[in-house]
């Protein structure tokens, strides 16, 4: 069996729930593991492999919303976790940040996987703004910690759910939308490397794009008719549940499948390159499927987003924004402790405060180099946790 072995590890209550929803969707070619400190809650996880961690420390009663307990529990059970991950080529670690087990244990699980040489991807959620402030503080700390121990990290702010669902949508239905990002990431990558195609992509291509690349953007789009490729690729790069764009990405995988033409492939690749910039390394895959009459599906995985910070594109980890500032000042470290004002700065062309339309260059941005960056209108909002500093 030459197929890459992919494992999804759901850590804590939210992680276990995400695994359950993926199992319900019957995603093939993936192994699932449920990890929790709460013995009773763990029994509700449908994963074939269940790991109760920190049994001596927590007595099976959970982490009590204390990340330090979750961390110690994972460290206590490190041998069991490593044994469960043995033989994997790629591991997705998913959790809801802000509580005890997910926030504390997920970075430990990720570190164990990465130390074993496994390509490790984190997919985590941030709490709703209406939740306790302490929970958000825990979440942001947890995101910083897991980021140190994964090759690639995808952050899903739960507040984004409020923008895409109506008022009558139930809580379970809304949270299922967040889990769809994880599902798309896993399904998209398994299809890339396990399904034969006209232009084939393999696990080595995935490693090239995702190994040690930091913050990532992933999306899947569908289209029909004459403009199906453009319709699908726009949907994929916008990913409404993420706060990232592909602007300034260093590496991008584009995989297009369906009833596709050469023109469709060219349209999709050209659009992505226009957004990401001339220096982006694009790896392209294509799978022709005549059964999908006049329709196509496009998967876009963009990584290395923070590497372009010096070119004026600052990725929004944990709800940050793409601040319009001189590129010489835009480094990840310089953002820490900055006193950021909530009013939009005036550009050199006197257009301060005017939000650009989506998928358009930001007018008047300071350009030491040729920058083809675009940000969505919503990305100009200054996050609450930075305003409070």
Predicted regions and their residues:
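Tubulin/FtsZ superfamily GTPase core signature
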Residues: 1-389
């Amino acid at each position: 069996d030459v197929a890459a072995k992919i494992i999804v590890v759901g850590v804590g209550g939210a992680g276990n729930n995400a695994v359950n929803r993926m199992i319900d969707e019957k995603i093939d070619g993936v192994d699932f593991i449920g990890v929790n400190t709460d013995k009773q809650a763990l029994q509700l996880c449908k994963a074939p492999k269940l790991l109760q961690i920190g049994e001596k420390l927590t007595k099976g009663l959970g982490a009590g919303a204390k990340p330090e307990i979750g961390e110690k529990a994972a460290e206590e059970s490190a041998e069991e976790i490593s044994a469960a991950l043995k033989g994997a080529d790629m591991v997705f670690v998913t959790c809801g940040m802000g509580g005890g087990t997910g926030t504390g244990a997920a970075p430990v699980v990720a570190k164990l996987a990465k130390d074993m040489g496994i390509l490790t991807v984190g997919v985590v959620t941030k709490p709703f703004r209406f939740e306790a402030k302490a929970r958000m503080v825990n979440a942001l700390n947890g995101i910083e910690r897991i980021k140190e121990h994964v090759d690639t990290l995808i952050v899903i702010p739960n507040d984004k759910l409020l923008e895409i669902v109506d008022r009558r949508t139930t809580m379970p239905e809304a949270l299922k939308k967040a889990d769809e990002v994880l599902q798309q990431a896993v399904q998209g990558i398994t299809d890339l490397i396990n399904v034969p195609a006209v232009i084939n992509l393999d696990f080595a291509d995935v490693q090239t794009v995702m190994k040690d690349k930091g913050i990532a953007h992933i999306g899947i789009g569908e289209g029909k008719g004459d403009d199906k490729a453009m319709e699908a690729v726009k949907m994929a790069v916008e990913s409404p549940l993420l706060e990232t764009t592909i602007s300034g990405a260093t590496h991008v995988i584009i995989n297009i499948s369906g009833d596709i033409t050469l023109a469709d492939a060219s349209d999709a690749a050209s659009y992505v390159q226009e957004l990401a910039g001339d220096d982006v390394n694009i790896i392209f895959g294509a799978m022709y499927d005549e059964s999908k009459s006049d329709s196509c599906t496009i998967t876009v995985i963009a990584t290395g987003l923070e590497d372009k910070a010096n070119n004026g594109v600052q990725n929004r980890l944990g709800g940050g924004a793409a601040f319009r500032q001189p590129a010489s000042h835009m480094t990840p470290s310089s953002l820490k402790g900055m006193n950021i004002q909530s009013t939009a700065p005036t550009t050199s062309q006197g257009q301060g405060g005017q939000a650009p339309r989506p998928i358009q260059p930001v007018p008047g941005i300071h350009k030491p180099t040729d920058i083809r960056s675009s940000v969505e209108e919503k990305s100009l909002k200054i996050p609450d946790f930075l305003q409070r500093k």
